[in-house]
Curated annotation (Swiss-Prot):
It is a single-pass membrane protein. Its cofactor is heme. GO terms for molecular function: heme binding; iron ion binding; monooxygenase activity; oxidoreductase activity, acting on paired donors, with incorporation or reduction of molecular oxygen. This is Cytochrome P450 78A5.
Amino acid sequence: MSPEAYVLFFNSFNLVTFEAFASVSLIIATVAFLLSPGGLAWAWTGSSKSRVSIPGPSGSLSVFSGSNPHRVLAALAKRFKASPLMAFSVGFSRFVISSEPETAKEILSSSAFADRPVKESAYELLFHRAMGFAPYGEYWRNLRRISSTHLFSPRRIASFEGVRVGIGMKMVKKIKSLVTSDACGEVEVKKIVHFGSLNNVMTTVFGESYDFDEVNGKGCFLERLVSEGYELLGIFNWSDHFWFLRWFDFQGVRKRCRALVSEVNTFVGGIIEKHKMKKGNNLNGEENDFVDVLLGLQKDEKLSDSDMIAVLWEMIFRGTDTVAILVEWVLARMVLHQDIQDKLYREIASATSNNIRSLSDSDIPKLPYLQAIVKETLRLHPPGPLLSWARLAIHDVHVGPNLVPAGTIAMVNMWSITHNAKIWTDPEAFMPERFISEDVSIMGSDLRLAPFGSGRRVCPGKAMGLATVHLWIGQLIQNFEWVKGSCDVELAEVLKLSMEMKNPLKCKAVPRNVGFA
């Protein structure tokens, strides 16, 4: 072989060898990258220490695209022995999740986790300007001050008792008409309670109420807006976790959100304008609903019309679905546990002098078993087991011994905590008595059961929501015996925006003899 040919052969061999080496190295690096503890997104962190110190599954999970991510994540935390804190990835989004009360409290109470991640749908639907998703700062603090001082104060909640009682009795009347007209005497609970809950929110927020039987009226129109918004917020949007997909809107989320917001602006904006005109003619300055309150704010607290629309729109969401879903879960449990329903009915009858009058807010403190039933339902079926708990680390922070980098999404698996046998005796059993023997607070101070959140981002309307649920459950049990219908009650769940019954409750409602009309 000539020297020139030898050199050419040697260089070609080196080139092939280098390409093979580079390919093998790339494959090895990619595999190592994907198998990093916590997965794909954690492999991008600058500190190797933060990557390996928190246990978790490798790769990139699509856990949120399923119907029960809270169960999947609970099983993974158990498998990796990572209940205090587990790392995982969804695309390029970096997550940590806690399934333990102590670590959960550390996360939810920390100023490092004062922000919330804003999904594309939440941003497009204006929620980045509302209480739930607004960035931590002066604007958010102003919203929180408005909520606690003006909107959800004990005095304001008490002032709406008549609204709650009236809508509860409207539901009773509607159910009676349905079971009378239905050959089987059955009713689909959520349809009634959801419309009642929407009516309750509309009356307290906007001062407007709708007829249960009005087909294609404003109430049905608003229900469609709310249902569309819930679906959009609950969709697993790949663009939230793969930044390069945001340009394309493959799932049509952005397009649907913008179409919905146009309708919301027209609907809510029109109501605000009506209130402005009414306010101009109201010399006494009476505040009958939340719009009146917001329009009456002074100076630094005053909101622009666009921000007011965002705040009011969020209230419709937060106040409608959660209440309706919780009432449905409670009634499902009452159908399945007739002995517990009987005991509750006797407690209500005793508090109302053997049912000679309808239940009122003042009776609720005298109904500990009712309160225990609601707590036990919240324990077994927390409305927001995962997604409503998400927080965003605004800077690097240690959670226990673990370094959590800025930009990490932190979550609490409340479902896992409330089903933990180390925390709760016989956790799968429905036993309201556990809350009679121990008075567990559900307002956020005890992370064994905190369905409304905790810390800075605790739900501002929790007291009003509980007042509504307690009263309506009491009214529905006082007026009806709830029994199994033609179909079995199935407790299968599906997590959308809230954790709902997969198969809506359909059962018999047998009217009781009461001493009031």
